[in-house]
Regions:
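Noncatalytic alpha-helical scaffold of FAD-dependent oxidoreductases
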Residues: 1-414
Length: 414
């Protein structure tokens, strides 16, 4: 049975297939296309909107064993990997080469899954999202056709951008099997800082000025007082208080990292920031960011026996969040149907408010099952019709991850 932490409805596939190569995926899809069998791709199972849930049964196509790093081009700063390679596995391989792949959603996702959901992470403010860091793809279409998109170059002005079409398609247009990624050199120095405020407004105003000032912050995250209280207890951050908090990371030379931190401290002080603590030791930096990545478990531990629903939206940074504007919420509630209904209603209110502010229904979690109802409001009927036409053209029998993104997409029995 497949379900995730925030989508309690479980569905069982009729079979699970473990793929090891693009050719195996192509053979499977050719067969499934001919016999109208649904196929739902599975990577590490870390998605939060029900993407890997096989709502119509069929095949759960597990790509986790397609985990080979195929080629690293040090001089060109790019790498080719199979879809089942995880982010930590890749960076572990690259470390001794002085290179790294920057997109960091927190969970140890597969690269294929990160492409499928158009993932980003805590350092998107400097390095961008998967959209900016994927150079090319190999994918298998619904009928088994193998297609290559993009390449190894940083830009191209030829033809439609099929790479960006597949990134964020959540396995509904094709199964991504290989990815060409952009790499970066490991910075000479890294520093982290934490600063606490008496108000959310002070923290947000600080970030707006930091970004407008051109300070090249590598990561920047805002944590509210309630989450800080949970993280202090869970991650033993005894020197911290339960206050609105900004977390920073700076990359560059030793001199530039120190200068960035000094500039950020001066700005935060002007907005009521206090106790700006700067650290360059790896142990201190890692502890700080691990606490951020453990926020989900900290929140759960703060309310034993409660269920949790996590959601994300994105808004302009002036409207209340920082960095790239991604806004994450964890809703904790008693494990009863009535409380669950209230949690879902609150989620809808949050998304509606984000759209009213010029934002989007999701910044990085994707659409899956949970955000389908908001696509028309966010994109409009003509754009939604274009999406539907693309889906019908590439997957006319609706076998690829049916029920996801579009409410009225073709189904496998159509």
């Amino acid at each position: 049975m497949l379900q995730d932490q925030t989508n309690p409805t479980a569905h069982e596939p009729d079979a699970v297939v473990f793929a090891h190569s693009t050719e195996e995926v192509a053979a499977l899809l050719k067969h499934c296309h001919a016999h109208h069998i649904p196929v739902t791709a599975f990577g590490a199972g870390t998605s939060l909107e029900g993407h890997v849930t096989p709502v119509q049964g069929g095949i759960s196509l597990d790509l986790s064993q397609m985990n080979q790093i195929l080629a690293v081009h040090d001089a060109d700063l790019d790498v080719r990997v199979q879809a089942g390679v995880t982010r930590r596995q890749l960076n572990g391989e690259l470390r001794d080469r002085g290179l790294f792949f920057p997109v960091d959603p927190g969970a140890d996702c597969t690269i294929g899954g990160m492409c499928a959901t158009r993932a980003s992470g805590t350092n998107a403010v400097r390095y961008g999202t998967m959209r900016e860091n994927v150079l090319g793809l190999r994918a298998v279409l619904a009928d088994g056709t193998i297609v290559d998109t993009g390449g190894r170059v940083r830009k191209s002005s030829t033809g439609y951008d099929l790479t960006r079409l597949l990134i964020g398609s959540e396995g509904t247009l094709g199964i991504i099997t290989e990815i060409q990624l952009r790499l970066f050199g490991v910075p000479e120095a890294t520093g982290a800082a934490i600063c606490q405020f008496t108000s959310v407004a002070g923290a947000v105003s600080s970030v707006i000025e930091i970004i407008q000032s051109g300070i090249p912050v590598a990561r920047i995250e805002f944590v509210d007082a309630a989450q800080m209280a949970a993280s202090i207890a869970y991650s033993k951050l005894t020197a911290m208080q339960a206050l609105p908090t900004l977390l920073f990371e700076f990359h560059g030379s030793e001199a530039s990292v120190a200068e960035q931190a000094q500039q950020a401290e001066a700005i935060t002080t002007g907005y009521g920031g206090a106790a700006f603590a700067f650290a360059t030791a790896a142990e201190d930096r890692n502890r700080l960011w691990q606490a951020r990545h453990d926020a989900f478990w900290a929140a759960r531990a703060s309310r034993p026996g409660y269920a949790v629903f996590t959601t994300d939206t994105i808004v302009p940074i002036s409207r209340g969040h920082v960095g790239d504007g991604n806004f994450h919420v964890m809703i904790l509630f008693p494990d009863t149907p009535e409380a669950a209904a209230r949690a879902w209603a609150l989620d809808r209110e949050i998304v509606a408010q984000a759209l009213d502010l010029g934002g989007a229904a999701s910044g990085e979690h994707g659409v899956g099952l949970g955000k389908r109802e908001f696509l028309r409001r966010e994109h409009g009927a003509p754009a939604l019709a274009m999406m539907r036409a693309i889906k019908t053209a590439l997957d006319p029998r609706g076998i690829l991850n049916p029920g996801k993104i579009l409410l009225d997409a073709p189904t496998s029995d159509g």
